[in-house]
Design a protein with these regions (language model features):
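Phosphate- and other anionic-substrate recognition elements at nucleic-acid/protein interfaces
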Residues: 1-179
């Protein structure tokens, strides 16, 4: 069961990470009462010409830098899935590990969500396309421009995580009240 992380700060910040071996998207949001406030987003570019170890280190170092810039209390990444290419899934798993290490080093709780769950929470459709995720991101945050779909995906992961944390906190309060 997830709990809201304890933080001295009034408004909790969460980071969503969309891992990839070439581009890893990230987005930081903050609860603002009943609303969600966009804080920042970007892409960690590992490049496609470096060897595997160099790419993983690049992802790790860039995410460390991002995490240090914000007051992140909790993080979420997308679960890996195997579609048709098991080797691609393995590589994605390695990129996910770099993201988890960056969060873990900073003592940030990491949650994982299936891609269809993220899409369902964010767009209302579990099989939403990348374009539909980007459109929903622009509707929810009209003043934010994303240079790549990886940023919008990371935002969707962060929003999904924030909603899940709030839902679990409300359920825990209701259970305690009922006992």
């Amino acid at each position: 069961m997830l709990n809201l992380p304890k933080k001295d700060k009034k408004n909790m910040q969460v980071i969503g990470i969309d891992p990839g071996m070439i581009n890893t998207g990230w987005a930081v949001i903050e609860e603002d009462g009943p609303k969600i406030k966009f804080i920042g987003s970007g892409i960690c570019r590992a490049g496609d010409k470096k060897d595997m170890a160099a790419r993983l280190v690049s992802i790790l170092e860039q995410l460390r830098s991002v995490i240090q810039r914000f007051e992140v209390a909790s993080g979420a990444i997308e679960k890996a899935f195997v579609k048709n290419d098991p080797l691609a899934a393995l590589k994605l798993g390695q990129a996910r590990a770099s993201a988890m290490i960056a969060l873990g080093e900073s003592k940030i709780e990491v949650s994982e969500y299936a891609p269809n769950y993220v899409k369902k929470i964010f767009t209302g459709k579990g099989h939403a396309t990348k374009e539909e995720v980007e459109k929903m991101a622009s509707l929810q945050f009209p003043k934010v421009f994303f240079s790549q779909s990886d940023e919008a995906d990371a935002l969707a992961i962060a929003v999904c995580h924030m909603h899940t944390l709030k839902l679990n906190a409300n359920l825990n309060r209701a259970i305690k009240k009922a006992m």
